[in-house]
From Swiss-Prot:
Its main location: membrane. Residues 576-591, 969-978 have a biased composition (Polar residues). The gene is DLGAP4. PANTHER family: DISKS LARGE-ASSOCIATED PROTEIN 4, DISKS LARGE-ASSOCIATED PROTEIN DAP SAP90/PSD-95-ASSOCIATED PROTEIN. GO terms for molecular function: molecular adaptor activity. This is Disks large-associated protein 4. The modification Omega-N-methylarginine is found at residue 291. Residues 1-30, 47-66, 157-206, 342-396, 527-751, 763-798, 915-992 are annotated as: Disordered. GO terms for cellular component: cholinergic synapse; glutamatergic synapse; neuromuscular junction; plasma membrane; postsynaptic specialization. The modification Phosphoserine is found at residues 206-207, 378, 381, 388, 405, 415, 421, 580-581, 609, 611, 665, 744, 973. InterPro entries: SAPAP.
Length: 992
């Protein structure tokens, strides 16, 4: 396909166009019947008179207007020096043009419109046909051989030449060409350079480049003409014409590729001018022969690739040469016009365009066409037009390994669907024609071929096993048998062939995948996707593909290496089950689970892409050892195929299990089998979010049984786990509240950490004080176990359960904490001789604490009891309790600050430490005195200094209180807003 290169317009010039006088000396105008409508008018009448030598083809192509040129590679390529290789003197072109009938060119202009519409999307890699563009001489020889084969094998084909009546009649075919030739040449020169530049820029040659030139030749035959007759209406000869043409091609293409040439080794006469070629067929036969040879070039070059990589398939193809011939005949002989053919061979995107003007069959089936079809989905398509030997060999191994069961199944639709996966198996987007087309045509005739090639789930573990060498011989035999049976059925199933879902073969992968899901494909397809995922069946790839048949093909092809094994190092989650041992572990698990589960399977449904992502990327959550024993159906999460929210659908690592799993893993599984897993196991997550409401009644019955101290103990436990220097109430309480189960267990052993916890609690007000140390804190008495939660935190439990029970527990905890502090301070006063100032502070703190407990705490207790009493007339709501509790918090914080100061004093051996404020007071008064000894000013300055210190103290206190109020308000609002899900989720979970 390179031949549409830069110098395409050059061959239109007179200097390069070969002469035709010596070739057509005996005829006046017959050789120039180029119009397809009258191409074969005298074919039978002058069989021997005007022999068209092989090189006559080339001149005719030059004299045709560009729209009717059907052999793209006859155009001189920039790679070739045409003047040296052109065997014809350049002078004769003028005479030929002068002799060309004007009416003929007029008919061309009328009857051969340029249809650019449908073909702009078909772009083929320019570098794909290295063997095709070798040299014009080689091409001419190739065309000669094909033409000789046509006319020697099918002499009866010429009789119907007169029947050609494409769009017009033969009436004035010869009358006004002289005046038009210059215009057509100018149009060609003007139009083709544009296409050439586009082709050069893109590096692809668009089908526009050739099909524009060839559209006329194809369309001129009208809708009734055969697929490849190129304007011939020869009803009687069309089937044999196809058969011979493509018998020639398919029969000999295996021989041509060994020497890397495009010549056909044609048994008929050598390339001398054949006397058997009727000259009047030149115009249209030239087109047809050129098309046939073009296809042959495609086939031979593609097969060259195949042959280089593996000889096994070549052998099987050689054995089934007869099948090739039958297939060529059968596959190309599409009854009716381009419409029916286009519906069969075109992808849905191209069908409209093809309905107007057919595209050459072989081009459609060539790897370049598939490349063009996959161009929009170029993610899957490999860039290189020619497959590397390794990839091609791998493909061969696939074919060999899977062909053993040829003929056992017959589901053409499935087999053709599988072709999408087949095409994705390897990055080679120029697959050899035998590899792609032969299986397709086999499946057309004997649909079992492809379905067997890619439909055997049991073959998967053996894909690259040692058995494939053992099976090669019988595989080739079976392949031959299948091909023969296909050939026998070729004629009978010609019409049926059109009904097969061939578009799936050329359709973009995503379309076929969607169609496969809709069709509910079964396990045979899964095996294909499994194969296509990654040739070496590593367990990870197997598990992935098992559940994600086609989409896994897509992604796996994009990411050529097989899926990475599970990332077990993601997070050391402790447990996923309801009995998770640590709140913090649950929190981390929930966070990661929620995020990842949202990524992979949102809404509990796993479409194939989601499940694919989960199998390839996010498996870290479930694979990180989180798979809960009660929920994970299969123990080894090492190769989890799917990540569901909490459980893993672990794929067994043993191949024997792979087969039964494959049944589950059909595309249906992507919608069905995977779906249950996310729905079963994410259910805890969904429950978590609504659990605060769901568990309300159960909570009342279960929670009161746990002592307050034990709950406070869990507070401290989880706070230890979190180890937050400042008790973020949003963090510690979600941790602390949820674990009635672990409370009784944890209460005893966790007392030692309580000291640090209490320290933090005490220093909550001014956490920044570095002097506070664990040693300075009171011993972990039983009442201290509950004191781990800082005064600000009790509002947070309300987040979990804001009812009378909860607030009563909080109140009792605070009461015990304050009482403990008071008792501790009483002991200290008795044991130590404290200064009056220190003693005053102790008495102040203890008195305020006792006052708070005796008045406000009692009032709040009454409110809680009213809330719990359904008969209470002014029954306070949970909101009321929360608000009152927030007010209590301010008082509790003040008292806590006082006790903090006392503990600082205790750590300092009850020695008062000058605070920075006092130092400021002392330092500030002296400066004003020396400045101005005015009478009143020193006093004023002292007053200012003291006032400034007082203001600073008050402002600091105000800021602190404001910050605390803001924190309490934040806590209060957080408990009532959706942000508090994290707070009550773990608790609700444990209660469940």
């Amino acid at each position: 396909m390179k031949g549409l290169g830069d110098s395409r317009p050059r061959h239109l010039s007179d200097s390069l166009d070969p002469p035709h006088e010596p070739l057509f000396a005996g005829t006046d105008r017959n050789p120039y019947l180029l119009s397809p409508t009258e191409a074969f008018a005298r074919e039978a009448r002058f069989p021997g008179q005007n022999t068209l030598p092989g090189d006559g083809l080339f001149p005719l192509n030059n004299q045709l207007p560009p729209p009717s040129s059907t052999f793209p590679r006859i155009h001189y390529n920039s790679h070739f020096e045409v003047p040296e290789e052109s065997p014809f003197p350049s002078h004769a072109q003028a005479t030929k043009i002068n002799r060309l009938p004007a009416n003929l060119l007029d008919q061309f202009e009328k009857q051969l419109p340029i249809h650019r519409d449908g073909f702009s999307t078909l772009q083929f890699p320019r570098g794909e046909a290295k063997a095709r563009g070798e040299s014009p001489g080689r091409i001419r020889h190739l065309v000669h051989s094909v033409q000789r084969l046509f006319f020697t094998k099918a002499p009866s084909l010429e009789g119907t030449a007169g029947k050609v009546g494409g769009n017009g009649s033969k009436k004035g075919g010869m009358e006004d060409g002289k005046g038009r030739r210059a215009k057509s040449k100018e149009r060609a020169k003007a139009g083709e350079p544009k296409r050439r530049s586009r082709s050069n820029i893109s590096g692809w040659w668009s089908s526009d480049d050739n099909l524009d030139g060839e559209a006329g030749a194809f369309r001129s035959s009208g809708p009734a003409s055969g697929l490849m007759t190129l304007g011939r209406q020869a009803e009687r000869s069309q089937p044999r014409y196809f058969m011979h043409a493509y018998n020639t091609i398919s029969g000999h293409m295996l021989k041509t590729t060994k020497n890397n040439t495009t010549e056909l080794t044609a048994p008929p006469p050598p390339p001398a001018p054949p006397a058997t070629c009727p000259s009047l067929g030149v115009g249209t036969d030239t087109n047809y022969v050129k098309r046939g040879s073009w296809s042959t070039l495609t086939l031979s070059h593609a097969h060259e690739v195949c042959q280089k990589t593996s000889a096994t398939l070549d052998k099987s193809l050689l054995k089934s040469k007869s099948c090739h011939q039958g297939l060529a005949y059968h596959y190309l002989q599409v009854p009716g016009g381009g419409g029916e053919w286009s519906t069969t061979l075109l992808s849905p995107r191209e069908t409209d365009a093809a309905a107007e003007g057919p595209i050459p069959c072989r081009r459609m089936r060539s790897g370049s066409y598939i490349k063009a079809m996959g161009d929009e989905d170029s993610d899957e398509s490999g860039g290189s037009p020619k497959p590397s030997p390794k990839t091609a060999a791998r493909r061969q191994s696939y074919l060999r390994a899977t062909q053993q069961s040829l003929g056992e199944q017959s589901n053409p639709r499935r087999s053709l669907d599988r072709l999408d996966s087949v095409d994705m198996l390897l990055p080679s987007k120029c697959p050899s024609w035998e590899e792609d087309y032969t299986p397709v045509s086999d499946s057309l005739n004997d649909s079992s071929c492809i379905s067997q090639i890619f439909g055997q789930a049991s073959l998967i573990p053996q894909l690259f096993g040692h058995e494939q060498q053992v099976r090669e011989a019988e595989l080739s035999d079976q392949y031959e048998a299948a091909c023969e049976s296909a050939c026998s059925e070729a004629e009978s199933t010609a019409a049926e062939t059109l009904d097969l879902p061939l578009p799936s073969y050329f359709r973009s992968r995503s379309h076929s995948y969607l169609r496969a899901i809709q069709a509910g494909c079964s396990q045979e397809e899964d095996s294909v996707s499994l194969q296509s995922l990654s040739p070496p069946p590593s367990t990870g790839s197997l598990s992935n593909s098992r559940t994600l048949p086609s989409s896994s093909c897509l992604v796996a092809y994009k990411k050529t290496p097989p899926p990475v094994p599970p990332r077990t190092t993601s997070k050391p989650f402790i447990s996923v089950t309801v009995q998770s041992s640590t709140e913090s572990a649950q929190d981390t698990y929930l966070d990661s689970q929620d995020h990842k589960s949202e990524v992979t399977s949102q809404s509990g449904l796993s479409n194939s892409s989601d499940s694919l992502d989960s199998s390839t990327r996010p498996p870290s959550v479930t694979r990180g050892g989180v798979a809960p024993a009660p929920e994970a159906p299969e123990p080894p999460p090492k190769h989890a195929a799917l990540k569901s929210e909490q459980g893993t659908l672990t794929s067994s690592e043993s191949h024997p299990e792979a087969a039964p799993k494959r049944k589950l893993s059909s595309i249906g599984i992507q919608v069905d089998c995977i779906q249950p897993v996310p729905k079963e196991e994410p259910s805890p997550a969904t429950k978590f979010q609504s659990i605060g409401v769901q568990v309300e009644d159960d909570w009342r019955s279960s929670v009161p049984s746990h002592s307050m101290s034990s709950r406070r103990d869990t507070d401290s436990d989880t706070q230890d786990a979190n180890d937050s220097s400042c008790k973020s109430s949003e963090r510690s309480l979600p941790d602390c509240t949820p674990h009635p189960n672990s409370i009784s267990i944890d209460a005893g052993p966790r007392q030692a950490p309580k000291i640090a916890q209490i320290k933090r609690n005490l220093s909550y007000g001014d956490n920044s004080d570095p002097a506070l140390e664990a040693s300075s804190l009171p011993p972990p008495d039983p009442w201290l176990e509950t004191s781990s939660s800082s005064p600000a935190e009790p509002a947070q439990p309300g987040a979990c359960r804001r009812d009378g029970y909860w607030f009563l527990k909080l109140l009792q905890a605070e009461t015990e904490r304050l009482e403990g502090w008071c008792c501790q301070m009483d002991k200290e006063t008795k044991e130590n001789n404290l200064s009056e100032e220190v003693l005053g502070k102790v008495l102040s703190a203890v008195g305020s604490a006792q006052l708070l407990m005796s008045q406000k705490f009692q009032q709040f207790r009454g409110l809680c009891e009213q809330n719990l009493n359904p008969d209470a007339n002014p029954r306070p709501t949970a909101q009321d309790l929360a608000g009152f509790w927030d007010l209590l918090q301010l008082s509790i914080e003040d008292i806590s600050m006082k006790f903090d100061e006392l503990y600082h004093l205790k750590a300092n051996s009850w020695q008062l430490v000058e605070t920075p404020e006092k130092r400021k007071e002392e330092k500030k008064p002296p400066p004003p005195v020396p400045k101005k000894p005015a009478k009143s000013k020193p006093a004023v300055s002292r007053d200012k200094a003291s006032d400034a210190s007082d203001k600073q103290r008050q402002e600091a206190r105000k800021r602190l209180l404001a910050a605390k109020r803001a924190a309490s308000v934040r806590q209060n609002s957080a408990t009532e807003s959706a942000d508090s899900i994290e707070i009550y989720v773990p608790e609700a979970q444990t209660r469940l």
